[in-house]
């Protein structure tokens, strides 16, 4: 994947704020080397690149049940989080951080893999259901609201990709080479619009990301 710093020239007045600025970015995945390259860790992949872009690094924070990185962007504090609770208990970590920093659900952006989108596609969404994604389900319960933002990174579904795997097995395996290349391209596209989301301009971020999906 290209090593590009997307945040270096962003000005505070570059975007028209239309929603609450994002103050907590959560990448979802499972901890440990056994899961590092699996589809379910797409949120971790993007979070790692955002930490690079924001010139910060993750460190273990046991009290928050996760890896935390702190940064400043456009004069505001931003926290990045990778829960180490395993996917199904992500809310334990997200809830702890949100309570500590007194953040509303609308100030939280969750990066996660999405079965209903093909590799190479990505969508932004606020609120709604969890569509069977156990990480989102647990976060919704922990925050007491579905109104957090989601950045849905397409990994495809076994059926849409012509595979016989069960979903539970599919998400815990690495993407095929072509799929990985498509996901990497999407991650670069996401990195380019995260500054807009940090400023609260989800209209711009949505227009840029959805317009490039090609389907």
Swiss-Prot record:
CDD domains from the UniProt entry: PTH
Please tell me which top-level EC class this enzyme sits in: hydrolase
List, alphabetically, the SUPFAM superfamilies matched: Peptidyl-tRNA hydrolase-like
Q: Where is this site: Discriminates between blocked and unblocked aminoacyl-tRNA?
A: 30
- Residues annotated as binding tRNA: 35, 86, 88, 134
What are the recorded GO MF terms, alphabetically?
A: peptidyl-tRNA hydrolase activity; tRNA binding
Catalytic-site annotation from UniProt: 40 (proton acceptor)
Matches recorded under Pfam families: Pept_tRNA_hydro
Q: Which PROSITE patterns match?
A: PEPT_TRNA_HYDROL_1 (PS01195), PEPT_TRNA_HYDROL_2 (PS01196)
Q: Which domain of life is it from?
A: Bacteria
Keywords of the record: Cytoplasm, Hydrolase, RNA-binding, tRNA-binding
Can you cite an annotated GO cellular component?
cytoplasm
Where is it located? Cytoplasm
- Site (Stabilizes the basic form of H active site to accept a proton) at 113
Keyword RNA-binding listed? The answer is yes
Q: Name the predominant localization.
A: cytoplasm
Q: Name one GO biological process term.
A: protein quality control for misfolded or incompletely synthesized proteins
Give the EC number(s) under which this enzyme is classified: 3.1.1.29
NCBIfam families cross-referenced by the UniProt entry:
pth (TIGR00447)
User: What's the family?
Assistant: Belongs to the PTH family.
The UniProt function text for this chain reads: Hydrolyzes ribosome-free peptidyl-tRNAs (with 1 or more amino acids incorporated), which drop off the ribosome during protein synthesis, or as a result of ribosome stalling. Catalyzes the release of premature peptidyl moieties from peptidyl-tRNA molecules trapped in stalled 50S ribosomal subunits, and thus maintains levels of free tRNAs and 50S ribosomes.
Q: What is this protein called?
A: Peptidyl-tRNA hydrolase
What lineage is on file? Bacteria, Pseudomonadati, Pseudomonadota, Betaproteobacteria, Burkholderiales
């Amino acid at each position: 994947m290209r090593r590009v710093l997307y945040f270096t020239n962003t000005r505070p007045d570059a975007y028209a704020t239309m929603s609450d600025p994002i103050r907590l970015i959560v990448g979802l995945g499972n901890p440990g080397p056994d899961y590092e390259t699996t589809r379910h860790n797409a949120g971790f992949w993007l979070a790692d690149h955002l930490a690079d872009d924001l010139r910060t690094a993750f460190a273990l924070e046991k009290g928050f049940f996760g890896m935390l990185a702190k940064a400043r962007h456009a004069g505001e504090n931003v926290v990045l989080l990778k829960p180490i609770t395993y996917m199904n208990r992500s809310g334990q970590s997200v809830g702890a951080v949100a309570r500590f920093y007194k953040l509303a659900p609308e100030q939280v952006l969750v990066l996660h893999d999405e079965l209903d989108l093909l590799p190479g596609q990505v969508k932004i969404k606020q609120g709604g259901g969890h569509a069977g994604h156990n990480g989102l389900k647990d976060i919704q319960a922990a925050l007491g609201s579905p109104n957090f933002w989601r950045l849905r990174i397409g990994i495809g579904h076994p059926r849409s990709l012509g595979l016989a795997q069960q979903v539970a097995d599919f998400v815990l395996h690495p993407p095929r080479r072509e799929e990985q290349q498509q996901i990497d391209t999407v991650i670069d596209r996401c990195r380019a619009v995260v500054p807009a989301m940090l400023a609260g301009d989800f209209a711009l971020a949505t227009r840029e990301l959805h317009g490039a999906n090609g389907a």
